[in-house]
Amino acid sequence: MGCARWLALGGLLALAGLLQARLLLPQQAGFGECDRFFYKGTPPAGLATEAHVRICQRFAGSERFATLYSPGHRIPVFSAFRAARPASRSAEQRGLLEPQIDDPDSNLEEVIDEANALTSVDNLGSKQALNADYIDSDYEIGQLYPFPLNSDLQMATFPLTNSVPMTQSFRERWHMNLNSLMDRALIPHCSEGKDLYILTGAVPSEHRVKGKVTIPEFVWLAACCAVPGEGWAMGFIKHTQDIDVIEDVMLRDLEKLLPHKPQLFQDNCGEMEQDTEKMKKILEVVNQVQDEERSLQSQERMSPLASTQSQRSALLSPEAPPEGGSSFLGQVLGFLATPFIKLFQLIYYLVTAVLRNIVHLLWLVAKQAINTVESCLYHLGEATVSYLVAIGQELVSIPWKVLKVVAKVIRAFLRILCCLLKAVCRALSIPLRVLVDVATFPVYTVGAIPIVCKDIAVGLGGTLSLLFDTAFGTVGGLFQIVFSVFKRIGYKVTLDNSGEF
C-alpha cells in the first residue's frame, strides 16, 4: 500500500507539473496569451477591479481558458472559454490550487495539490478557497464551467479558481444544463463550436461558507457565435436558491443583471449582423431543455411522496397474524375480499396520482401563464416607461425650444433696429449744404434749360457764320491767286474797267 500511495502521489505531481497558471501583473494588459478566448481579443469591460486577479490557465504547454478571480470572495468573477465541451458528469473531480494567489512571493509557477501546498505556500487559504472549507458543510465544490484540463475520462482535473460553492442537487442540475445546452443548442448552431466564445460567471451574495467562501446568488453563462453573417449572442442564468429551471435572457438583459452593468462582448458580439433565425432555432432547443428539467424536477418531487404513501399503506393495513381459532369460513371470506381490497387500494392510488398530476399540471400551466403575464407586463411597463420618458423629454424641451424661437425673434428685431439706427446716423452725418444742394438741384436744372438752349443756338449761329467766313475767305483767296497769275502774264485787270481788257 505504501508503494502504491507513493506512485499515486508521484503521478499527481507529474500531472500538476504539466498544469500551469500564469498570474498577470497589474501593469500587464488583458490576459496575455489567453486573450484569444475573448471575442476580438477583448475581455469584458466593467467587471475587473484592482482587487481582482487575472489568471491564464494553461495545461501541457498550451492555454486552456482565462479566469478573473476575486480574492475577497474567494470565487471567480468569470471564466472565458472557446470551443469547449463540458466534462462528463460521471467523472471524478480533483481540484488544484494556485499558490501565488495566497503567496505572491512564491516561486511556484504551477498549480499544485492542496496537500503539497500546506508545506510550501505561506498564508495558504487567505485569499482562495480550499477543499477543507467545504468539509462538514451543506455545499460542495462546483465548477462554473466543468471544462477539464486533462483528457482522462475517469479523473477530471480542475483548478479551484474556477469553482464556487454549490449544493449537490444544484451542481448536478447546472452541469446537466450546460451539457444539454452545449451539445444540443449552442455548438451545433455555431460551426461546431469553432467560432463560439463562452463566458461563465457568478454574482456573489451576502452569505458565505464558514464565513470564508462566498455563496453565489446566481450563476450565468453568455455565448457569442462569431460566424460572419450567421452569428448570434445569448445569455443564461440560474439562481442557486431557487428551484426554477435555467432561464434564457438576451445579452443586454444579462448585462443589466450583473454588477456595474458591464459589456461582455465587444460591440455586443456583432449585434448588427446577427442571424435572428438561428436564435429562434436555438431557443426552440432551449425550451426543450427547460421542459426536460421541469419534468425531472416533477419526478424528483413525486418519488418521495410515493415512497411515503407506500410506507403509510403498509402501516395502515398490516398483514394480520393467523389465529389458531379462526374458522374456515373467515379464511374464505378473507381470501375473497383481499382482491377487492387490493383493487380498491389500487384505484385509490391511481386516483390520487392522477389528481396530483392534474394539480401539478395546473400549477405548471398557472406558473407558465403567470410568467407569461409577468413578462408581458414587464415589457409593457418597459415600453410605457420608455414612452413616458420620451414624452417627458419632449415636454421638457418645449420651453427650451420656445426660448430659442423668442431669442431668434428678438435677435432679428435688434438687427432691424440696428440697421434703422445706422441709416438714421448716416443721414444725420450728411452736411446741411449738401442737403440744400440736393433739394435745389431740380430748380437749378429747370432754370438752366433756356440758357443751355440759348448757348446751343449761339453756338450753332457761330458755327454757320464760321462756315460762311471760311467759304468767302476761300473764294477770295482763289481770286487773289488768279489775279496774281494774270498779273505776271501781262494782263492787267482793274476793277474799275467796265469789262474790257
UniProtKB/Swiss-Prot annotation:
A cellular-component GO term for this protein:
extracellular region
Main enzyme class: hydrolase
Chief subcellular location equals secreted
| Keywords, comma-separated and alphabetical | Acetylation, Endonuclease, Hydrolase, Immunity, Innate immunity, Nuclease, Secreted, Signal
Please indicate if the UniProt record lists Magnesium as a keyword.
no
Q: Which GO terms describe its biological process?
A: innate immune response
Signal sequence span per UniProt? 1-21
Q: Provide the E.C. number(s) assigned to this enzyme.
A: 3.1.30.-
Tell where it localizes.
Secreted
Q: Which CDD domains match?
A: NUC
Classification via Gene3D superfamilies: Extracellular Endonuclease, subunit A
Q: Which residues carry this modification: N6-acetyllysine?
A: 408
Question: Which SMART domains does the record cross-reference, listed alphabetically?
Answer: NUC
What terms describe the molecular function in GO for this protein? Answer: endonuclease activity; metal ion binding; nucleic acid binding
State the function annotated in the UniProt record: May act as a DNase and a RNase. Plays a role in the modulation of innate immune signaling through the cGAS-STING pathway by interacting with RNF26.
**Recorded family membership:** Belongs to the DNA/RNA non-specific endonuclease family.
Q: How would you summarize the oligomeric state and partners of this protein? A: Interacts with RNF26; this interaction is important to modulate innate immune signaling through the cGAS-STING pathway.
Q: What is this protein called?
A: Endonuclease domain-containing 1 protein
Provide the species name: Mus musculus (Mouse)
